[in-house]
Amino acid sequence: MGKLHSKPAAVCKRRESPEGDSFAVSAAWARKGIEEWIGRQRCPGGVSGPRQLRLAGTIGRSTRELVGDVLRDTLSEEEEDDFRLEVALPPEKTDGLGSGDEKKMERVSEPCPGSKKQLKFEELQCDVSMEEDSRQEWTFTLYDFDNNGKVTREDITSLLHTIYEVVDSSVNHSPTSSKMLRVKLTVAPDGSQSKRSVLVNQADLQSARPRAETKPTEDLRSWEKKQRAPLRFQGDSRLEQSGCYHHCVDENIERRNHYLDLAGIENYTSQFGPGSPSVAQKSELPPRTSNPTRSRSHEPEAIHIPHRKPQGVDPASFHFLDTPIAKVSELQQRLRGTQDGSKHFVRSPKAQGKSVGVGHVARGARNKPPLGPAIPAVSPSAHLAASPALLPSLAPLGHKKHKHRAKESQQGCRGLQAPLASGGPVLGREHLRELPALVVYESQAGQPVQRHEHHHHHEHHHHYHHFYQT
């Protein structure tokens, strides 16, 4: 039956029956078939069929009486008993008979490109116009489902195909009722206002009743949660990692700034952090190109260690006091290159380790950034003797604990005063370079802050604890 109705040429095909010749005419093609049949019957002459049909009016519910009147006029009484005309009509409750059937025939003859499965003719035979109440709508909102904030057309297409397959497999198909399923997808990157919504109307999906439609909705919600679950896990892990990273960075920056304020040295690296080499290992490292003595920046820290940790003191931190002769000679070779550039800061050969002349060098090097190897470098012990930012932190800690060392340092200074004043060959260069750091460590920890600040501003005014003579 479906093949007959899909071809217009087979509408008025003759067929033999025991009762005589008859015609099978569809309601959609009744006008064209009746006109052709009337034209063939009245071929010798007379009024043509279309004119008579125009006078009769449109084809409606009275199609059978109209065809009967035409046949009574054209056929004789004998022929009228032999011929019968059968017209296949749809149910009378359908409104808009001709237009609806024509749309149905066109839909069957031309397959829809969007539908995946071919529909049979029987399913659309009693189809009616779509009502607004029969539509069902699902809305999916995915927040940053690819973790980079960029959504391409391929992602939307693949996502819509997946949603379509899930909805199609979960909805019951019924030939009695038809509903339009509207799938609305909204992709919003992290709650921003830019949204891309795609509206897909699937008219060929059939659903039974609203009771059976709640199950696919729950399935789709669970599917959406499964899609978003790994993304939420990845986002939480990223947040935890980034928080730890920021915390570590802040802690390292605060620690580095604290040591920069204490020592007054630029590009100063922390040695209290985990995994850092010991102080004795860092003393053997080669010097940097910009400042040969900058690599020995652990010496001020070795002096700070007894103040900060008086109970558990590392014996390697006192390497400046217990340095062997081989290390002192190596230190002398390193400092020999900077001796020529720092001659104009020293007044006499005996006063090379004098804290007064070196204090200006440390002050200039601290206030101005290092320009290159041409600027003379000073030992970190001179930085300790000259930096006023270091003294307020040393005085409150060392004033109480190391108060008894002031008298010992005075006796040591007076004892060493005579050989240095005479300039005899008793003390060599190695001991001469080693003594200022030792005396600076003992004297600065015990003396008040006011005397050293006074000493820095008035370099010609000498106190009793200085063992150099001018």
Curated annotation (Swiss-Prot):
Q: What is the lineage of its organism?
A: Eukaryota, Metazoa, Chordata, Craniata, Vertebrata
What switches on expression, per the entry, is described as:
Expression is induced by activation of the Wnt signaling pathway.
Q: What is the name listed in the Swiss-Prot or TrEMBL entry for this protein?
A: Protein naked cuticle homolog 1
Q: Specify the species.
A: Homo sapiens
- Segments of skewed composition (Polar residues): 192-205, 271-281
Write out the residues that bind Ca(2+): D144, D146, N148, K150, D155
Instruction: Give the UniProt family note.
Output: Belongs to the NKD family.
Q: Where is the composition biased (Basic and acidic residues)?
A: 92-109, 210-227
Domain EF-hand residue range list? 131-166
Listed A to Z, the keywords are:
Calcium, Cell membrane, Cytoplasm, Lipoprotein, Membrane, Metal-binding, Myristate, Wnt signaling pathway
Residue ranges under compositional bias (Basic residues)? 452-470
Region annotation Disordered: where it falls in the sequence:
1-21, 90-114, 192-228, 271-314, 337-357, 446-470
- Residues bearing covalent lipid (N-myristoyl glycine)? G2
Q: Which InterPro entries match?
A: EF-hand-dom_pair (IPR011992), EF_Hand_1_Ca_BS (IPR018247), EF_hand_dom (IPR002048), Nkd-like (IPR040140)
Q: Subunit notes for this chain?
A: Interacts with DVL1, DVL2, DVL3 and PPP2R3A.
PROSITE patterns (alphabetical): EF_HAND_1, EF_HAND_2
